[in-house]
Regions:
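A conserved beta-strand->alpha-helix junction
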Residues: 135, 140-143, 312-323, 420-438
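Short, glycine/charge-rich flexible loops or terminal/linker lids adjacent to PRPP-binding catalytic cores
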Residues: 309-354, 364-365, 392-398
């Protein structure tokens, strides 16, 4: 699963980027776009560029700089790219995107951000009908549906496939003639459109446009498909109207997205500041300093400090070169890994009552270790504040998460969690406070399934999920 056993965090599965421009070095533009999206996936990366006839593909494991040592060299005007978080079992080069296929309708390269909830059933049917799969990704279901579609054009084939899949999917696809962007009917994952001087770009987040000096135009709507070619940009609503029900993942604002992005018109940075202000309004703790667990809680901690007048301090220093591990550690190894990544500063925390802010608690293991570390460094009291409600349910819409029984808030009260992590106080931001923080997006347009179990699209059973992970 895309869960970091050291830092007790969920992770976004991936980021996607695409370019259509006849005047620029497309491969370089895709590379820099992916570089800006590196936070959305650090285990593999891939770039596919095309001139409409041939496709040049480069991909590899690791960070972008490790995965792609040389850019593809084909003279091209279209390209798509992908960065991905892999899982323990799917650390396989065959699963690196974009997926490129040649079929009777032409050629396509597909980059997918999200998770299909009906992929297993479709895959079984396709295999029964003779399809052969080369990877264990649900994304390969999409390319098979496109290839088998009876529609006349590649764009119509893509729309036909999109109507058959369910769950979370933001797609960036190159065909022989066009760059295509598709967002699922719920809009679980973000996707936006930008403009270069002579072309257009698609991205999971707007922050990637700044890297190539592209202008943000708008977010792609749920259920929408945009087609970019030499005629410009065309838009169509491919989804049936009754299936469009916007439910953007609220965790994009809490943790996943980069602070300098805007999603559905709402600044991620301002939203996180608001979360900190709402936390202060709900707690009114009397403390000496406000701190974050870097980096995910930092902006909310700044918001808390500004609202309260309590000074913000950096009492935990992060080692940015410690890397990431998928080894399932025992308690001793986990504590060592946390100490390798974070170090408490006695001269900052000694004798202090500390408001400590993080974005979420998944299993509670790391929070307890950090509280222990701060108290060993001389902290007097720790008031733990979480800038989201308690996570009680798994996510099935693009974040591979723990099964519910492994989520500490699913089986423990807040007081029990406080005692488990040995904090003096513990407070989770209320759903109402979170909605006030994300004030630019209506509550009805946000997905809170990981907090309240309200899954708007049918999700697989745990048995089906187990089959999926065995495949991976």
């Amino acid at each position: 699963m895309n869960y970091d056993p050291i830092f007790d965090k969920w992770h976004e599965e991936c980021g996607v980027f695409g370019v259509f421009d006849r005047t620029v070095d497309v491969a370089r533009y895709v590379y820099w776009g992916l570089f800006a999206l590196q936070h959305r996936g650090q285990e593999s990366a891939g770039i596919a560029i095309t001139d409409g006839n041939e496709v040049a593909l480069k991909k590899g494991m690791g960070l972008l700089t490790e995965a792609i040592k040389e850019l593809p060299t084909l003279k091209s005007h279209m390209g798509t790219g992908h960065v991905r978080y892999s899982t323990t079992g799917s650390n396989n080069p065959r699963n690196i995107q974009p997926l490129v296929i040649h079929y009777q309708g032409g050629q396509i390269a597909v980059a997918h951000n999200g998770n299909l909830t009906n992929a297993l059933g479709i895959r079984r049917q396709l295999e029964a009908d003779g399809s052969i799969f080369q990877t264990t990704m649900d994304s390969e279901v999409i390319v098979n549906l496109i290839a088998r579609s009876k529609a006349d054009t590649q764009e119509e084939r893509i729309a036909d496939a999109a109507r058959q899949i369910e769950g979370a999917f933001s797609l960036v696809i190159t065909t022989n003639d066009s760059l295509v962007g598709v967002r699922d009917p719920q809009g679980f994952r973000p996707l936006c459109l930008g403009k270069t001087e002579h072309g257009y770009v698609l991205s999971s987040e707007s922050c990637a446009f700044d890297a190539i000096k592209a202008e943000f135009i708008r977010d792609i709507d749920p259920g929408e498909m945009v087609i970019i070619d030499d005629r410009g940009v065309r838009s169509t609503i491919y989804a049936e109207p009754e299936k469009i029900d916007k439910k953007l993942c609220v965790f994009e604002y809490i943790y996943f997205a980069r602070s300098d992005s805007k999603i559905d018109g709402q600044s991620v940075y301002e939203t996180r500041l608001n979360m900190g202000r709402e936390l202060y309004n709900e707690t009114k703790y009397d403390a000496d300093i406000v701190m974050s667990i870097p980096d995910s809680g930092t902006t909310a901690a700044l918001g808390y400090a500004r609202a309260s007048g309590i000074p913000f301090a950096e009492g935990l220093i992060k080692n940015r070169y410690s890397g990431r591990t998928f080894i399932k550690p025992n308690q001793e190894e986990r504590e060592l890994a946390v100490r390798m990544k974070l170090n408490a500063m006695p001269e900052v925390v000694g004798g202090k009552r500390i408001v400590l802010i993080d974005d979420s608690i998944v299993r509670g293991t790391t929070s307890g270790l950090i509280v222990k570390m701060l108290k060993e460094a001389g902290a007097k009291e720790i008031y733990m504040c979480v800038s989201s409600p308690a996570i009680e349910y798994s996510c099935h819409y693009g974040i591979d998460t723990s099964v519910r029984k492994e989520l500490i808030a699913a089986t423990h009260t807040i007081d029990e969690i406080r005692d488990y992590i040995k904090a003096d106080k513990l407070h989770y931001l209320s759903k109402e406070g979170l909605c006030r923080a994300v004030s630019g997006v209506p509550e009805a347009d946000l997905c809170f399934a990981c907090f309240n179990g309200d899954y708007r699209v049918d999700v697989p059973t745990e048995q089906e999920e187990g089959v999926k992970y065995v495949l991976e």
